[in-house]
């Protein structure tokens, strides 16, 4: 993104390029490997304790029906969703991410789709829609229309489940705010290149409010200092019988 304040469309296009470039090393941050390795034992303990909480949450989701994974990446969450799923559709905009996911997971129940989630239309109905570290990459102006669209993909009684970063006083730890640009524009650096992408940090209450504005009731918890997780369901409309 060059010249002036980046538009959301420019940010999203560069975000796709960033994750295409990051695909070979994406999981290093989660597992504290490579350039993300640290000797801080206290940090390592807290990080691993909290990632274990996320994994237990995902492992206990009801995946027996049709499952849709948004921005599936290289398989970090697909590996936990696929074993118990009836059928899993994994979508990402990055071909390199999908290739690494397919190689890592190697499960015939997983159907891979390369698509831009913000322009994608689906005919299917899913019992569970899962988003791992994707909510924080949705621009504010895209939030409500995106989740209204996802609501059409949910089967009756269907659930959205998610894990993501949580807001904290030290956020963002990785990447820099774009000076004078929109609050959700952040610069990420990778192997000598810079990418300006969308990155937002929610607190549980602000995420509940954001989902509410899109027509969902959300239940959000934190793991402690690093992450949040939870579920969201469509708000039940008052029936005609309740009108007085």
Residue ranges and their predicted role:
Residues 2-62:
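Conserved class I S-adenosyl-L-methionine
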Residues 66-119:
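Class I SAM-dependent methyltransferase SAM/SAH-binding core
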Residues 130:
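A conserved beta-strand element that flanks and buttresses the S-adenosyl-L-methionine
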Residues 133-137:
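Short catalytic micro-motifs in class I SAM-dependent methyltransferases
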Residues 144-156:
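A short glycine-rich, Lys/Arg-flanked "PGG" loop and its adjoining helix->strand segment in the class I
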Residues 163-213:
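C-terminal alpha-helical "lid/dimerization" subdomain adjacent to the S-adenosyl-L-methionine
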Residues 216-244:
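Core SAM-dependent methyltransferase catalytic element
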């Amino acid at each position: 993104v060059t010249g002036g304040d980046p538009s959301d469309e420019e940010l999203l296009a560069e975000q796709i390029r960033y994750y295409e470039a990051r695909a070979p090393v994406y999981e290093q941050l989660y597992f504290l490997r490579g350039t993300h390795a640290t000797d801080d034992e206290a940090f390592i303990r807290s990080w691993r304790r909290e990632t274990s909480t996320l994994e237990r949450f995902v492992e206990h989701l009801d995946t027996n029906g049709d499952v849709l994974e948004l921005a599936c990446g290289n398989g970090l969450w697909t590996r936990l969703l696929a074993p118990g799923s009836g059928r899993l559709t994994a979508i990402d905009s990055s071909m390199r991410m999908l290739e690494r996911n397919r190689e890592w997971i190697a499960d015939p129940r997983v159907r891979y789709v390369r698509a831009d989630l913000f322009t994608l239309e689906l005919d299917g109905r899913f019992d569970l829609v899962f988003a791992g570290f994707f909510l924080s990459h949705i621009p504010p102006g895209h939030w409500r229309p995106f989740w209204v669209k996802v609501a059409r993909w949910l089967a009756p009684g269907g659930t959205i489940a998610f894990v993501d970063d949580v807001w904290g006083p030290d956020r963002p730890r990785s990447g820099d705010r774009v000076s004078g640009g929109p609050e959700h524009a952040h610069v990420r650096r990778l192997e000598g290149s810079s990418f300006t992408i969308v990155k937002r940090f929610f607190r549980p209450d602000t995420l509940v409010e954001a989902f509410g504005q899109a027509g969902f009731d959300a239940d959000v918890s934190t793991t402690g200092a690093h992450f949040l997780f939870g579920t969201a369901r469509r708000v039940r409309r008052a029936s005609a019988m309740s009108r007085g």
